[in-house]
UniProtKB/Swiss-Prot annotation:
The gene is GET3. Zn(2+) binds at C280, C283. It is found in: Cytoplasm; Endoplasmic reticulum; Golgi apparatus. ATP binds at K26, G27, G28, V29, G30, K31, T32, T33, E243, N270. One of its GO terms (biological process) is tail-anchored membrane protein insertion into ER membrane. Its EC number is 3.6.-.-. This is ATPase GET3. The active site is at D57.
Length: 349
């Protein structure tokens, strides 16, 4: 390319049309800190709009990052009133689903109900499925707002996902396309076998309810699929550290995301030492290795926003510390000017 893209996330923060932002990468590279920082900057940039940060990682860290307890329902961040957070809880969600299912079947001794209760907690991919249900819920609220329907639900300008490590995230992002195909097949089969089931007797109204619900879900899933593959509405921010394994996994993830037609044009590189003028030999040696992989990333991702974030002297916890750290997503870190901040973070309460 003849020009280098800005090494910041400014284009994402100020892209007014974005509805969904995914933040993902290998385990332990700083996804939660990055997603929290993105959410904080969005909330600061648009003080009159509401934002939601959702953790889809089974091992949640949002409560630790903000020093505030979050759960399965969206809760406002203390000190940032237009940002809410929630952590997907599979156990609580499955309990809610079973309660809803009782309206169709009140028999407590039903072996099928008992079997489903035992199975759901251990189904592979249940976290991804529940996260997707949360997406469907917000799509429904979005549609109600567009139609002018009355809704008590908060309308979020943008929803940010603090995702699980790469494999879980890729499974989650495959769900819309896979579900759309499955529901189309189901619709086709129900058209063929529906009359036969009616002839066998009973359950006509219940069948109509089920088919109506399936049509509604199919419409929402198609809408999700459409929005997730629209670069004006959805983008993915890759997070990594400057090491071989992380770089390798980032490349694999980008190739996979491109195969889903998902927009990805930003990479955040965390935990950089910037140790040119440091007397510590270990730091200099580590920085030399980091620079080698940074150079490779610069060549490999010249048409990406490559954001370089420093390793700080203490943990980045609490809204005030996140505000300080997240500024470097918009203004590149300069070790000569900003070095003092590395050791200036407040002690998390």
């Amino acid at each position: 390319m003849d020009f280098e893209l800005e090494p910041t996330l400014e284009s994402i923060i100020h892209q007014d049309s974005l509805k969904w932002i995914f933040v993902g990468g290998k385990g332990g590279v700083g996804k939660t800190t990055t997603s929290s920082s993105v959410a904080v900057q969005l909330a600061l940039a648009y003080p009159n709009d509401e934002f939601l940060l959702i953790s889809t990682d089974p091992a949640h860290n949002l409560s630790d990052a903000f020093c505030q307890k979050f759960g399965k329902d969206a809760r406002k961040v203390e000190g940032l009133s237009n940002l809410s957070c929630m952590e997907i809880d599979p156990d609580a969600a499955m309990s809610d689903l079973q309660t809803q299912a009782q309206q169709y079947n009140n028999d407590p001794n039903d072996p099928l109900k008992s079997m489903m209760s035992d199975m759901t907690g251990s189904i592979p991919g249940i976290d991804e499925a529940l996260s997707f249900m949360e997406v469907l819920k917000h799509i429904k609220n979005q549609r109600a707002a567009d139609d002018g329907s009355e809704s008590n639900a908060i309308q979020y300008k943008t929803i940010i996902f603090d995702t699980a490590p790469t494999g879980h995230t890729l499974r989650f992002l495959q769900l819309p396309a896979t579900l759309e195909k499955l529901l189309a097949k189901f619709k086709d089969l129900s058209g063929k076998f529906g009359p036969m089931l009616n002839m066998l007797g009973g359950g006509t109204n219940q069948q109509q309810d089920i088919f109506s619900k399936m049509n509604e879900i199919q419409k929402s899933v198609s809408e999700v699929n459409e929005q997730f593959t629209n670069p004006d509405m959805t983008t993915f921010i890759c997070v990594c550290i400057s090491e071989f394994l992380s770089l390798y996994e980032t490349e694999r993830m980008i190739q996979e995301l491109m195969s889903y037609n998902m927009d990805v044009n930003s990479i955040v590189v965390n935990q950089l030492l910037f140790a040119e003028e440091d007397d510590c030999k270990r730091c200099q040696s580590r920085w030399k290795m980091q620079k080698k992989y940074l150079d490779q990333m610069g060549e490999l991702y010249e048409d990406y926003h490559l954001v370089k974030m420093p390793l700080l002297g203490s943990e980045i916890r609490g809204v005030n510390n996140l505000k300080k750290f997240s500024k470097f997503l918009l203004k590149p870190y300069d070790p000569k000017v900003d070095k003092a901040l590395v050791f200036e973070l407040e002690e998390a309460k």
